Every structure is written in structure tokens, then in C-alpha cells.
UniProtKB/Swiss-Prot annotation:
The modification N-acetylalanine is found at residue 2. It is found in: Cytoplasm; Mitochondrion inner membrane. Its EC number is 1.1.1.27. Homotetramer. Interacts with PTEN upstream reading frame protein MP31; the interaction leads to inhibition of mitochondrial lactate dehydrogenase activity, preventing conversion of lactate to pyruvate in mitochondria. The gene is LDHB. This is L-lactate dehydrogenase B chain. It comes from Homo sapiens.
Amino acid sequence: MATLKEKLIAPVAEEEATVPNNKITVVGVGQVGMACAISILGKSLADELALVDVLEDKLKGEMMDLQHGSLFLQTPKIVADKDYSVTANSKIVVVTAGVRQQEGESRLNLVQRNVNVFKFIIPQIVKYSPDCIIIVVSNPVDILTYVTWKLSGLPKHRVIGSGCNLDSARFRYLMAEKLGIHPSSCHGWILGEHGDSSVAVWSGVNVAGVSLQELNPEMGTDNDSENWKEVHKMVVESAYEVIKLKGYTNWAIGLSVADLIESMLKNLSRIHPVSTMVKGMYGIENEVFLSLPCILNARGLTSVINQKLKDDEVAQLKKSADTLWDIQKDLKDL
């Protein structure tokens, strides 16, 4: 007796298992992981989305909640499991998992605890998706990108830290607000370490090709009567502010990660400030990851733009590199 489905649907092609073309995995279904997931779904970037976490109930609940929105999405397959086999054949894997910083905990201690988490996660990712590109989002992102590169054995063009992509977006938003224009028409770059010691490249800030520093030579300095330096200060403090108000940040980082993925899956060769291996650049001698303007396309992070930086900006970059190396050199089991 034919089933309803057999009566309804007459097959033309033989049934066979299809390998996904644009599969994306998100590791960690906390606030940031789910913001990445919904941003990826909203931009219809994946034909399959896989979620992984150690918390099975939370994981299944998030998967079901997203699946129930399938009518409103163009991602035909949403799966989840604590077993990494569910991630097989991913083009891109986003890592948001990790332990949170406890009150009064040193960064080195936090990093070492996250290294221990990553020692389990990263080999599993590479086992099931040996050709993937890994985007690291967990903090401190620059150090954990280095850790991921070391643990994965992947070439450096396939291990990328979300880095200053969000810092630069915040910078452009805040400047654009001051000027009354859209952030996409306000160009400016935050480079270096994601967070407190990031570098605002004031010399490159422009609107429609007009250098703002030429209009106001004091821009970004302490002598500036308009106090533009405050904008960079607000960028650095903005995450702390949001965390103080709502307990965490997630929407903007989720959107910024989807932006990076779009450049790669659509082979756009757009330029983003993301964390990459900077040894040999700007006189940096150690294997550290910092944000520089990088070209992202289907192969991953294929090139770095040689940004003309002023001496004090280079000095700041080197200082960041030294700070990071001080922590990295003491990490165990890499």
C-alpha cells in the first residue's frame, strides 16, 4: 500500500545523500553563539547550520526553537548535537565556547582555563571538517586565535579571530552619529588587540575620501578642542557599559561575525579588521595574532593590507604584541 507521501510525490532523481555546499557550525550556544546563529540565518548564508555545546537540554531547545522558524528562513537544515560528527563537512566553524572570566581572575588564568576547553574542541572540529575555516570569537580573542592555530594545525589563512571587526564597527557608528551620516559612509579603522589596547588609526579616518585629520589636524590628540579622542575611548568602554547594563554583549558581535562569513562564503574579497598572525610585520618578532586590515574570500584570509601607520601607532601595536606574548609564552600544553 502506497503511503501518502508516495501518492503525493513522484521522484525524478534517485534519492542520495547530498553533501552541503555552505554548511556553518557554531560551537557554543550561549548568548553570543545564538546571536551568531540568528545573524547567519537572517542573511541566508548557510544551507545547513549545526550547533554544538556540552549542555544537551539547552542545545536541543535552541535547535528546536530555530527549526520552528523554518518557514521564515531559507536554511533547509538545522541540526545540533554534543557529538562533533554533526559538524562534518562544515565550510566555516565559529567558536564562541569558553569559560567566563571570574571576578578578580587574571587574564592568564582565564586564558589557561580556555586553553583546556579548546584542547577538546579544536581537534574535534578539524577531525570532521579538515578543510574548514575557523573563526574564533571567544575572549581574549587574539590569544585564543593563536591557541586555535596551534591546536588545529591549520594554515594561518584558515584561522581567523573576529578581532577588531566589531571595534571598528562601533568606531564608525559613533563617528557617524556625531556627523549625522550612515556608518557605511564613515571610514575608519581600529587595529591591534581587541579591547583595551586597540589602536585608532586617525590618519585614515575619512568621509567620501576627505581626510578628517586634514580638516582638524589635532583630531585624535589631547589638544583637540572637539575631543574626538573620546570616540575611541567610548569604543573601548562600550562592551563594559553594555555588560553592566544587560549582563553580556551579543547582537553586535553576532552581526559582525555574519558579516565576516558573508565575505568568505560569497567570495567577496572585502577587507575587514580581523585577527591574524602578524609576526614579521611592523617589527613584531613573536607569533602573536592582532587585527590588521585583511582580505577575506572563499579561501579564507588571503592577504593583509600594508596600512601606513604613524610611529606612535606602530609603537602601540608593538606594545600590544608584547603584552600578548607575555601571556602566550607561559601557556601550557600547546
